């Protein structure tokens, strides 16, 4: 389903009624979780830029050869490179497609979009947030001023100008975004899917409410008693969640707030490699770091113990000091 297609409230309610929202254990393996994402689905990705990216699940989707996905995220980083370069996504919907704050716009994205085999659909950052929020609210659109008069307007015919019935002012109506599945990485959750997020939540709460199903990857699975001791930290409730995967360092080489910072040596080497040659550089990276390892633990070993320990030291120090 194209990312611009808006579903009716009746359809959303019908889909919601079909979901199993019972309090049950939902723990599955990384391989099983990736199997829940089917070819051609619209996939919402949690986190932002290089923060709490569900990299382990993206890694597994590439390994399983998923195809023709339309992926949406508030800001895309090297995850977008891998989704395009690994042949998983045909379209990425976002507000900024960069390899990270330090390295600027993605040359991998530019290569594929200019070649015409992939699509990059650009919205403003606020528009992405309001699209997920509209999806979570079950309304077909929300009004914003962002993008009015900008160069994005001619590129986004899906957004409609509208005269406010109360003030007469021009507003822009952005269509709801209801992904088939959301993949979100969190610091901790219980086996039922009650997820707690430390630090910035980005658009993850609205994304979880908007999606037809939710897969959580988590640094660790904790007891329900621990979740209940800090109920104010629970941002995504169990009734939204369909599967839970425990994946330590599941956002690597990106960061997970309070636990580890980005693994910069690995990131810098990656960027240098793919920027030198977006096709062959990406192929070499995928062969070594995605298709080569037997499992996620082996991928982490390729990053190296020294870098992981240093990223963990920095992450915990910044959180606690």
Where do the language-model regions lie?
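Conserved alpha/beta enzyme-core scaffold
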Residues: 1-321
């Amino acid at each position: 389903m194209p990312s611009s297609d808006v579903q009716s409230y009746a359809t959303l309610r019908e889909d919601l009624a079909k979901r199993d929202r019972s309090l049950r254990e939902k723990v599955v393996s990384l391989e099983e979780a990736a199997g829940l994402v089917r070819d051609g689905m619209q996939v919402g990705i949690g986190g932002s830029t290089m923060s709490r990216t569900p990299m382990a699940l993206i890694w597994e989707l590439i390994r399983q050869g998923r195809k023709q996905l339309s992926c949406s995220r508030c800001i895309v980083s090297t995850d977008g490179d891998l989704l395009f370069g690994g042949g998983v996504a045909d379209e990425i919907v976002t507000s900024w497609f960069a390899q990270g704050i330090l390295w600027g716009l993605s040359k991998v994205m530019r290569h594929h979009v200019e070649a015409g085999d992939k699509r990059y659909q650009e919205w403003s950052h606020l528009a992405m947030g309001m699209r997920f929020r509209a999806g979570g609210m079950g309304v077909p659109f929300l009004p914003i001023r962002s993008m009015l008069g900008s160069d994005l307007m001619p590129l986004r015919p899906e957004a409609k100008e509208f005269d406010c019935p109360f003030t007469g002012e021009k507003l822009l109506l952005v269509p709801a975004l209801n992904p088939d599945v959301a993949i979100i990485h969190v610091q901790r959750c219980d086996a039922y899917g009650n997820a707690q997020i430390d630090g910035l939540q980005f658009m993850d709460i609205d994304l979880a409410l908007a999606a037809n199903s939710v897969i959580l990857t988590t640094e660790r699975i904790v007891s329900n008693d621990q979740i209940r001791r800090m109920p104010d930290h629970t941002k995504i409730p169990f009734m939204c969640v369909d599967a839970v995967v425990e994946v330590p360092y599941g956002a690597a080489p990106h960061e997970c707030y309070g636990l580890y910072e980005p693994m910069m040596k690995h990131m810098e080497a990656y960027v240098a490699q793919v920027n030198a040659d977006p096709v062959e550089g990406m192929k070499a990276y995928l062969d070594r770091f995605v298709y080569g390892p037997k499992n996620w633990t082996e991928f982490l070993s390729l990053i190296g113990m020294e870098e992981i320990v240093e990223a963990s030291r920095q992450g915990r120090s910044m959180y606690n000091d």
